[in-house]
């Protein structure tokens, strides 16, 4: 990457999630502390690669769209990642769909990418920058 790229990483505030739920069976051993640790590590990695990174941790839907919309109004992003917890957990599918449409309307210039777990965020972003 030759110039500093701006990246928005959208994911659930991990302390709001019930990792013991059957919906999280695909992520054995995951908990809020591990998610936050992985996000912070990937944030640091992306910064080391020259990216300007912002974490946008959202709730389970009550204010999520407003929080993301406010971020998009403040700044233009080159790449936006929506985390696997938002994207892959069936009970969050409608919120994921609403966020995609929000990004389409308010950040049409941004590349969209998706991680498969909290530890591969940097790789997902690098695919599109």
Regions found by a protein language model. Give the residues of each.
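Short beta->alpha junction loops
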Residues: 54-63, 115-117
């Amino acid at each position: 990457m030759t110039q500093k790229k701006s990246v928005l990483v959208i994911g659930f505030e991990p302390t709001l999630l019930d990792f013991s739920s059957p919906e999280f069976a695909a992520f054995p051993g995951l908990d809020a502390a591990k998610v936050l640790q992985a996000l912070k590590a990937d944030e640091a990695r992306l910064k080391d690669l020259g990216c300007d990174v912002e974490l946008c941790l959202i709730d389970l839907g009550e204010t999520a769209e407003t929080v993301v919309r406010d971020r998009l109004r403040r700044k233009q992003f080159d790449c936006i990642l929506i985390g696997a917890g938002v994207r892959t957990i069936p009970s969050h599918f409608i919120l994921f769909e609403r966020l995609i449409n929000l990004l389409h309307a308010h950040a049409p210039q941004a590349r969209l990418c998706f991680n498969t777990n909290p530890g591969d965020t940097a790789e997902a972003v690098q695919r599109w920058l």
